[in-house]
């Protein structure tokens, strides 16, 4: 995905999980005993990433395996876990060794929030402990005061671990930018930064991700925000699918609950999602027309990020309200194009951009020497972004997950739930 191009009549040779050769079908030679996967008329692209994933934060590995399967079945070959748990370190190791099937796993530690950080000193000690334990980064949730946040950020820089996630209301977007987030997720703090006098409001009044004050935004402030984000090299994980499917009035909760992908989730979970959306729509502050304008404002912010070279990463927040792991990544890609990105620009957010962000050149490209994380598609996603859903198979390093195998495993999940 380093260029917007299609290379016709290609053969890709994989050995021990790596691409060892690729080129014109008439010229590339390979062992006659090799397993041949017929991709005639199909399109091979790098595996996708879900950069705002949730792996169950529990002691039991079995629920984790189900979520990993859903990601892999949807062509997701890298995930960034945004709600860490001690057993996730073990899970990461078992995925790396091949003991457990799953995408490449980058994980945060347990959340830094208003409840988990009772003091500045406790927050600093949490940072040191998570760095020592081996987590890849720190996850920020709402509730931190600016003093506790400052202590956390200072210690994180001292010990060499990045932090990402929400922007606590008391911290605000400008302190967050100055502190040097690795990623800001959900466009958190963006709308507040556009609202004059936002300091006189409360988090509860504004609603989740400021959904109730979108009409107060002064869009002439957007260029200042974009410049600051670009200059500080702070990447964005919009999770627009969460807003479009949960907040938007035009998507009926019962209809969403009956979408085909919901059959792979526990019914209690889907019922909770349904009630969560219905309760939001009953909120006295909820105004359908205003929320539709808020959704359009979020799309504009995504478009402006892309236009102004603020790095974008693919992340939908799954599982979360009506976001089934893996499936929600395809929704997110579509919403990125709805925001004005081309299919190629949207695909970059889940491929080559991820490699740049993680400083791993093996992620997001198809070339000799890189890890074979690949997806075979029925059609060309550069002309129709919805083609990412039409998966013929997934190469997960040295494992080929055929369409037949994927369908069989998904059927098992369906029968369970």
Feature map (PLM): residue ranges:
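Divalent metal-dependent hydrolysis catalytic cores, especially in the metallo-beta-lactamase
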Residues: 67-87, 102-111, 131-144, 161-164, ...
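Metal-associated gating/positioning segment near the N- to mid-region
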Residues: 39-99, 115-121, 147, 174-180, ...
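Acidic, glycine-enriched loop/beta-strand segments at the rims
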Residues: 1-11, 24-27, 296, 324, ...
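Histidine-rich, glycine-flanked metal-binding segment
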Residues: 4-45
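Metal-dependent enolase-superfamily TIM-barrel catalytic cores that perform enediolate-based chemistry
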Residues: 116-168
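Active-site neighborhoods of metal-dependent hydrolases
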Residues: 126, 133-136, 144, 195-339, ...
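Surface-exposed amphipathic alpha-helices with a cationic face
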Residues: 92-96, 149-160, 230, 302-306, ...
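Divalent metal-coordination and catalytic microenvironments
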Residues: 12, 17, 41, 49-52, ...
């Amino acid at each position: 995905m380093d260029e917007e191009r299609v290379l016709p009549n290609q053969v890709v040779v994989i050995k021990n999980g790596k691409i060892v050769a690729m080129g014109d079908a008439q010229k590339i030679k390979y062992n006659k005993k090799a397993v041949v996967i017929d991709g005639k008329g199909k399109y091979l692209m790098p595996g996708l990433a879900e950069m705002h994933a949730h792996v169950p934060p529990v002691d039991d590995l079995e629920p984790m395996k189900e979520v990993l399967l859903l990601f892999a079945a949807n062509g997701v070959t890298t995930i960034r876990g945004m709600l860490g748990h001690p057993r996730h370190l073990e899970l990461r190791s078992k995925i790396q060794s091949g003991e457990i099937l799953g995408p490449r796993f980058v994980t945060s530690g347990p959340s830094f929030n208003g409840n988990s950080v009772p003091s500045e000193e406790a927050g600093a000690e949490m940072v040191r402990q998570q760095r020592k334990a081996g987590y890849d980064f720190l996850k920020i949730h709402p509730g931190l005061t600016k003093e506790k946040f400052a202590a956390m950020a200072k210690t994180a820089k001292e010990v060499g671990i990045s932090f990402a996630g929400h922007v606590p209301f008391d911290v605000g977007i400008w302190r967050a930018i100055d502190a040097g987030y690795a990623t800001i997720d959900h466009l958190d703090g963006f709308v507040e930064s556009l609202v004059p006098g936002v300091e006189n409001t409360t988090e509860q009044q504004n609603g989740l991700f400021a959904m109730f004050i979108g009409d107060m935004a002064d869009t002439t402030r957007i260029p200042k925000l974009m410049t600051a984000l670009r200059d500080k090299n702070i990447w964005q994980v919009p999770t627009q699918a969460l807003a479009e499917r949960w907040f938007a009035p035009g998507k009926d909760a019962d209809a969403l609950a009956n979408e085909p992908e919901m059959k792979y989730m526990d019914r209690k979970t889907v019922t909770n999602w349904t009630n969560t959306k219905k309760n939001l729509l009953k909120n006295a502050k909820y105004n359908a027309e205003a929320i539709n304008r808020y959704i359009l404002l979020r799309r504009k912010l995504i478009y402006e990020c892309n236009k102004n070279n603020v790095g974008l990463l693919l992340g939908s927040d799954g599982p979360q309200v009506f976001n089934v792991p893996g499936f929600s990544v395809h929704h997110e890609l579509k919403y990125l194009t709805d925001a004005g990105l081309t299919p190629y620009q949207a695909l970059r957010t889940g491929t080559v951009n991820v490699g740049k962000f993680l400083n791993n050149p093996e992620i997001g490209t198809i070339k000799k020497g890189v890890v074979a994380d690949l997806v075979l598609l029925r059609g060309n996603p550069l002309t129709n972004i919805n083609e990412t859903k039409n998966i013929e198979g997934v190469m997960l390093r040295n494992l080929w997950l055929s369409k037949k195998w994927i369908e069989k495993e998904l059927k098992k999940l369906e029968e369970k739930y």
